[in-house]
């Protein structure tokens, strides 16, 4: 019989230190082995020289780092990063399109309804990245017609500060957040700005109905805009419990911050964030090369390294303690589910007054 060794504080710390040491290896400009197709695409991209990336599903620092990593591997092709929340990015793109301006070459968004709209209007290019079949099956074929692909995933969970909430009283489910003991302690982003928060709200509305949010209001949550505002509110100690992706807070816990991550018994929300190449791109080769890079081994390793983000690829191990959607109860958000987001935003404003 095989015995499983228990995970102790010492062994967990050792794993984290080993992981950190691995991440400390400096990046190099060495290219991976390029296929003939990718090399041909790269040669064409070098003639274009740059691309502009509209992106919502990373913070600004991470998005800029991804752009630098791409240029290190593909010298001569620069990435101009335009980063904002999902709805702000899409508003800017919509203004570009109305003005006939081809400013964005690549769009990455946490809101799948953006891609459904663009696809319907024939504003996305058809492109299947070479790396598309290298991701876990769960993340393949976000669009069967190859107009957008999953390039990032988030597992939305509950986080709490141990100096604000005792472990015995900590929430175990989304329903627990309705308990009066969390009044004045909760922090969330806003579905009118953040695609991730929108997906979370759509999921819980579908599961529990809008009465869930009406009850949640009674606990006086603090509502930011971006889901990243939850990090700010919890890091400052202003609030003690919130919902966000799990990676950032697991990393902070390993670094000594008073955080614990709860994978809700009624389901962590799995959100796929997509990427598409704009049909009117003036840098179509650079755009395709970059879209392929986002799901490369190098790019996915960079995300795990910097943010402890979930990996889309089986050949890129997750950070210490990372959970996959197969290991915990989940609520999975489909493209069709996100069509409900427009009406939900209005209900959210009516309920929470913002």
Go through each PLM region and give its residues:
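Extracellular/periplasmic bilobal clamshell ligand-binding domains
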Residues: 317-354
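N-terminal export leaders
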Residues: 8-13, 17
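Periplasmic-binding protein-like
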Residues: 153-155, 181-192, 214-217, 223-224, 255-281, 294-318, ...
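A bilobed periplasmic-binding-protein/Venus flytrap-type ligand-binding module shared by bacterial periplasmic
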Residues: 159-164, 201-202, 271-286, 302-303
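A ligand-binding cleft/hinge motif common to bilobed small-molecule-binding domains
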Residues: 113-117, 240-258, 307
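Extracytoplasmic ligand-binding site segments that recognize negatively charged/polar headgroups
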Residues: 54-67, 79-97, 102-238
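Short, polar/charged alpha-helical segment
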Residues: 35-52, 56-78, 158, 252
């Amino acid at each position: 019989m095989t015995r499983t060794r228990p995970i102790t504080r010492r062994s967990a710390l050792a794993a984290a230190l080993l992981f950190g040491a691995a991440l400390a290896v400096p990046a190099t400009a060495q290219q991976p082995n390029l296929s003939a197709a990718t090399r041909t695409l790269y040669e064409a991209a070098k003639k274009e020289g740059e691309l502009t990336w509209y992106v919502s599903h990373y913070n600004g620092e991470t998005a800029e780092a991804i752009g630098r990593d791409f240029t290190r591997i593909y010298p001569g092709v620069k990435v101009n990063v335009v980063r904002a929340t999902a709805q702000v990015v899409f508003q800017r793109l919509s203004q570009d399109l109305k003005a006939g301006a081809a400013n964005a070459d690549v769009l990455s968004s946490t809101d799948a309804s953006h891609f459904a709209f663009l696809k319907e209007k024939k504003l996305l290019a058809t492109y299947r990245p070479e790396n598309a079949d290298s991701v876990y099956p769960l993340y393949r074929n976000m669009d069967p017609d190859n107009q957008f692909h999953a390039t990032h995933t988030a597992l939305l969970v509950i986080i709490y500060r141990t100096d604000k909430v005792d472990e015995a009283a900590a929430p175990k489910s989304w329903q627990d957040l309705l308990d009066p003991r969390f009044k004045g302690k909760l922090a969330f982003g806003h579905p009118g700005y953040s695609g991730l928060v929108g997906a979370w709200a759509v999921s819980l509305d579908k599961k529990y109905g809008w009465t869930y949010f009406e009850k949640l209001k009674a606990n006086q949550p603090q509502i930011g805009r971006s889901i990243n505002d939850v990090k700010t509110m919890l890091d400052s100690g202003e609030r003690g419990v919130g919902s966000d992706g799990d990676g950032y807070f697991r990393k902070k816990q390993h670094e000594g911050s008073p955080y614990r991550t709860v994978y809700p018994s009624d389901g962590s929300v799995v959100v796929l964030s997509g990427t598409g190449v704009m049909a009117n791109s003036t840098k179509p080769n650079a755009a395709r090369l970059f879209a392929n890079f986002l799901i490369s081994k190098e790019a996915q390793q960079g995300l795990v390294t910097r943010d402890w983000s979930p990996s889309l690829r089986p050949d890129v191990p997750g950070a210490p303690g990372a959970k996959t959607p197969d290991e915990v109860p989940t609520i999975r958000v489909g493209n069709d589910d996100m069509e409900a987001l427009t009406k939900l935003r209005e209900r959210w404003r009516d309920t929470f007054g913002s």
